[in-house]
């Protein structure tokens, strides 16, 4: 799919989402080779792991800095899909790990039905400076199914953190938390303190804080910064407005009159009155040929309105990405085998029954079991590569692949994009 998108729209930037479960350097390098411009790294990485990938992958990296954590591993969870048909790997997780579950194996006297799988929300906003320092290009907030108040609190805190300003951590916590936050993954401190549930006290604090949270965005209005340049000469006026990408012009026919004093300040004041528009004047230049010249305020206001209206129309014009006509290759026809086949997976070689060779097409065993497989069984054995390879496990897996390539095995079972490069 990635190659097809690249062939059809080569200028369209492609970002690899967290559902791709990229948590190793080799996974990020594979995305680069496929033409991706950015990879969203798994939430479970530590800061040194993020740094290693960011500094060596050759594409932009994006990291989660606030929001919900998955009890499983990013892009590897099927719990919601199996229990309710909503796949977390397709961005539709229903969050079943937040529910209480029975654990019959708990010691006697301890309650069994508890929130054994519920993690606190991740929050590493106070480490934004460290992420910036190692080259992370973008900070990501997990805000799916959250309220506007939550989004306002998280965004405000991130903006403050990015600029090195203090932010109200209590206000952020009251917007939504599960008995506090955790930074365990990024800090490399993975322990029981990462677990938390949404208590009645948490919900009550959120309710009390809602008015303050709403103030964060009640008067908010996004403004597009623009630069203006007005040029005045004896025959008339010209105003140029640009947002950095688009440029618009307006021409006036009011005959300027010689000015007794420098009109630069009054002209800038009139041009900066962009209220009622989505624009804000960030820079204003005034150029006068043979002046100083006086131009009536009404004429300047008309120039401003005309130029900003023209700029707005240009911004509203859709600019589609260039698209190539590509002939799609025909899909290969799939034919059913003449008889059913069975591929059986076992965790350890000791679990394989003696009669398995005659009853299965392939045995599947973890690659760590390779040395235990007798040579006469290897041509029917697929070696399973680990789904997750945090830390040194990626290098260890690469060594195991090199050691087993010529050992007579039927092949490997892959489950992560990084496996393609090992």
Region roles according to the model:
Residues 1, 7-13, 29-422:
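Surface-exposed amphipathic alpha-helical tracts and adjacent flexible/coil segments at the periphery
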Residues 11-12, 16, 20-25:
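Gly/Gly-Pro- and Ser/Thr-rich, intrinsically disordered tail segments characteristic of DNA damage-repair
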